[in-house]
Amino acid sequence: MTVVLGLGSNKPWQQYSSIELLVKAVRALKALLHDIRFSSVYESAPMYVTDQAAFCNMVVAGRAEDSLSPHDLLDQIHKIEASLGRDRSREIRNGPRSIDIDIEFFGNKKIRFSDSQNPLKSLEIPHPRLNERPFVLIPLLEILNKSADNVDSTLYAHKEEFMQMLKVTGSDGVVKILDAEAFEKSV
């Protein structure tokens, strides 16, 4: 089944820039997903907490093995984030981070799971704020336009809906800074 992830970074870690952190994250995700396709990298103004650096964002789509559950994927994502310098215990919610990986879609699953004991286990799919995030919608539409034959038909069926969401949010402040082909050479 097709999994769609949104990736973002706006805080260098060790000697790595935000783009280098995205490259490292995609390399790690290759162990979890097959037939990976990725968008270009876009720069966008921060949302929610605006007093921080601009983000580098992209979307990755790939096929997950049937044995990989959404919660297993979430656990693996948290390990990747931690390995790339993300420390959730010390960060401001929606503040700067070395890497952020969100599950936007997991096939056609709809999940709404909340764990008050361990908020890191909470999961909502599709991502609940997709409709307000042009920095996810623009790269997602890029992938759908480039690889319609390789994308789950359920996801492709929502293309018009994504385009309508983008009309509402607008695309101001989201600028392509590295095309997918150039990014691919680094991965």
Q: Which role fits each region the language model picked out?
A:
Residues 47-55, 71-75, 79-187:
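Flexible, gly/pro- and Lys/Arg-enriched active-site loops
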Residues 2-7, 11-93, 97-98, 107-109:
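Nucleotide and nucleotide-moiety/phosphate-recognizing core
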